[in-house]
Structures are given as C-alpha cells and as structure tokens.
C-alpha cells in the first residue's frame, strides 16, 4: 500500500485470496474524479471476498457501478491509467484486464506474468458483453478480435518497458516450472535483465527488479516493495520485503495469527 493512498497495489486476505495490480495504458480516456482507483478496487476485493472467483466478480461489479481512474501519481497529479489484476487462491488463478468499463478475463492454466500492458488477446474466457461491438465501432479491430490489440495505447505501453519485463518473467517461470518455490520466486523478483546490469544503462524500465535512473524516462521506475504468497491448504505464508530494491532486501515471513509479530 503506497503511503499516500487508501488502496493497495498487492495484498492477501485471511482466506488466502491474493491480488496484484498493474497500471495499463489504453486508448480510452481516463476519468480523474468520482471513480475508484485500481488500488481501491484491489483493497475492496480483498476485504469482501473469500475466493479468487468472488474477488474477480466483485472488481467487475465495482467497475461497472463506479468506473475507474483517479490520480495515479504521488507528485504527478496528471498521471492516470487503467488497471490489470492477477487474482489467485489455493485452487485457481485469474487474469482480469480492463480498459475503462470494459474488461476481459482469462483463467491461468500453468503460470502467468503481467506488467504494464494488456496481455489477453483472442483467448479470453469471458469479456464485457459490449466490448467487441464498442471496439468495432471505433475501428480498432483488424481481423480477429484481440482485447489487447483493440484497446492498448501503443506509445505509453511501449515506453513503459512492459513487454521486456513480461517476457523475462514468463521466461523465468517457464524455465523453473517444475521447481517453482519461495526461494526461486525470490530470485525472480531480484532479477535484472543483464548480468552486468547497472541502473544508468537502460533507457526504459525493462528489469523485473527496477531501479530509478535517467531523469527523462526512468525517474519513477523503482521497485518499492515485493511480496511472495505461499498458498497451502492451511493459512498462507506471506513473504514481504517492505523495502524497495528486492535485490538488496530481505524477505520477511508473515502469517495471519491474530497476534502482532515482534520487531525483527
């Protein structure tokens, strides 16, 4: 939870429902006032749901009733965006991606990575009932309908470095598919795209573990926290850095026990 807002960018509740949120950039105008931020939607879903399926539906319902947008930057009050969500519990996981009031969902079969881009194409499992007709009316559909191709804003999505991060995360998950555990997940979250990486070398934020640099394009590209949730039949174990730069941070375990963990 960023200190300056009510909502949260990632979290887990006592039922083992886990949600992560990412900003995405679309062709639709982003409302600034009297709407819910993506972080509001995430927190409300965690407060009110007991499964990934109910969390997914709750976000969709809130999206239709209140819309989304708001101020997305602490200092830059003009920074606005739409949202994507990765939602999981101990039995299933879903990707929910949005553009204004429109949305598409996809059930995760094995592994999935989201970044600052729409990723659901033709293979959605469910979609807003008017999304395809709306995109066709706007002239955004070329050939078979793809949610990401129809609704993505090319410029902001490209310069966010989202494709490189999403591809790198997917590559790491695929190469370690049969041995994904807490330890390997920590390594993934500490990953830089090159072995000789230094923050000043990259013009865009293309590392999973991002470091702010270059005042023009990457002054705000800093990983400020990281979280891993180990879901089991019992209560989840939550590993958090609670500090920026995962490559320099220690992951601390937390549990839902009803008692306050003493300072480490």
What are the residue ranges of the model-derived segments?
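A contiguous strand-loop segment
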Residues: 1-38, 58-183, 237-239
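Second-shell loop/turn segments in exported
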Residues: 31, 41-49
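Short, charged, surface-exposed loops that flank catalytic or proteolytic processing sites
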Residues: 48-56
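Intrinsically disordered or highly flexible coil/loop and linker segments, enriched in small
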Residues: 51, 68-72, 198
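Generic alpha-helical secondary-structure signal
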Residues: 57-58, 188
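Accessory "access/gating" subregions that flank catalytic or transport cores
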Residues: 165-224
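Substrate-recognition/cap regions that form aromatic- and gly/pro-loop-enriched pockets
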Residues: 206-264
């Amino acid at each position: 939870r960023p200190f300056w807002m009510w909502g949260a960018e990632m979290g887990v509740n006592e039922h083992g429902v886990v949600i992560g949120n990412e900003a995405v950039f679309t062709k639709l105008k982003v409302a600034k006032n009297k709407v819910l931020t993506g972080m509001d939607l995430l927190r409300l879903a965690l407060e009110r749901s007991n499964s990934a399926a109910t969390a997914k539906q709750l976000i969709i319902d809130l999206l239709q009733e209140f819309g989304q947008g708001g101020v997305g930057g602490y200092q830059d009050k003009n920074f606005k965006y739409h949202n994507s969500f990765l939602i999981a519990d101990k039995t299933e996981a879903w990707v929910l991606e949005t553009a204004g009031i429109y949305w598409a969902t996809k059930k995760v079969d094995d592994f999935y990575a989201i970044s600052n881009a729409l990723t659901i194409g033709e293979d959605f499992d469910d979609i807003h009932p008017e999304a395809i007709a709306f995109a066709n009316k706007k002239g955004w559909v070329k050939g078979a309908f793809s949610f990401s191709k129809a609704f993505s804003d090319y410029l902001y999505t490209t310069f966010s470095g989202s494709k490189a991060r999403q591809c790198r995360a997917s590559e790491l998950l695929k190469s370690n598919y049969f041995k994904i555990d807490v330890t390997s997940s920590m390594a993934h979250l500490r990953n830089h795209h090159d072995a000789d990486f230094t923050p000043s070398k990259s013009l865009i934020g293309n590392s999973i573990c991002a470091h702010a640099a270059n005042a023009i394009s990457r002054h705000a590209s800093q990983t400020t926290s990281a979280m891993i949730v180990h879901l089991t039949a019992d209560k989840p174990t939550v590993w958090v850095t609670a500090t920026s730069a995962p490559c320099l941070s220690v992951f601390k375990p937390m549990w839902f026990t009803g008692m306050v963990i003493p300072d480490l």
